[in-house]
């Protein structure tokens, strides 16, 4: 399902057409992680790409609706080792005119021999097999696309304002299992539930 969700048709260099993926539907539009992964996929498919993804920032202006969309991926600056991108997703609005739903930036870079160091050690947590997988919460499709085994930071069981932290720690993988790559990592980076849900543990009511 994930690879199908990322399928894009190139109309011209940097111009791609895609379809909103129903298997990754959220409460409003697709799961934001798969939207981010689709933007990155456009960069990876661009014939002028230099190097591999180094950074990705996505700004969600509005939810995608069901149907087709267009991605514009533009390499705005290419240096000797790095390349900088601007990204946007457009869909037809109520009047048929294109409307920007999502924007983003990305940086790709050539891999060179250098040094590396890890300043933040991995947290000491139980092994995945020692933690139960949580069933999908809410009636949204995208939660069925992942297996999650939380250590801490699950959705509050009681919404009484008793939240005291916003830390989420969990093991996760695609369901069914799929090898990790740049796009799947970009999608998984958005899996965590909203911080405010954990910190406040309080529902809000809408006024009509």
Which residues does each PLM region occupy?
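Terminal targeting signals and extreme-terminal segments of soluble enzymes
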Residues: 1-208
């Amino acid at each position: 399902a994930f690879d199908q969700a990322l399928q894009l048709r190139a109309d011209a260099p940097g111009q791609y057409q895609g379809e909103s993926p129903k298997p990754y539907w959220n409460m409003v539009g697709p799961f934001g992680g798969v939207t981010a992964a689709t933007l990155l996929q456009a960069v990876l498919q661009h014939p002028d790409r230099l190097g591999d993804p180094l950074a990705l920032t996505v700004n969600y202006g509005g939810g995608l609706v069901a149907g087709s969309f267009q991605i514009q991926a533009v390499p705005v600056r290419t240096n000797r080792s790095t390349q900088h991108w601007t990204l946007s997703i457009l869909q037809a609005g109520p009047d048929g005119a294109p409307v920007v739903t999502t924007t983003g930036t990305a940086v790709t870079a050539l891999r060179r021999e250098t040094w590396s160091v890890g300043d933040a050690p991995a947290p000491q947590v139980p092994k995945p097999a020692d933690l139960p997988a949580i069933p999908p919460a809410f009636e949204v499709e995208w939660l069925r696309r992942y297996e999650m085994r939380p250590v801490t930071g699950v959705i509050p069981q009681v919404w009484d304002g008793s939240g005291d932290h916003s830390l989420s720690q969990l093991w996760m993988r695609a369901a069914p299992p799929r090898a990790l790559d740049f796009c799947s990592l970009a999608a998984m980076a958005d899996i965590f539930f909203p911080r405010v849900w954990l910190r406040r543990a309080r529902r809000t009511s809408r006024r009509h």
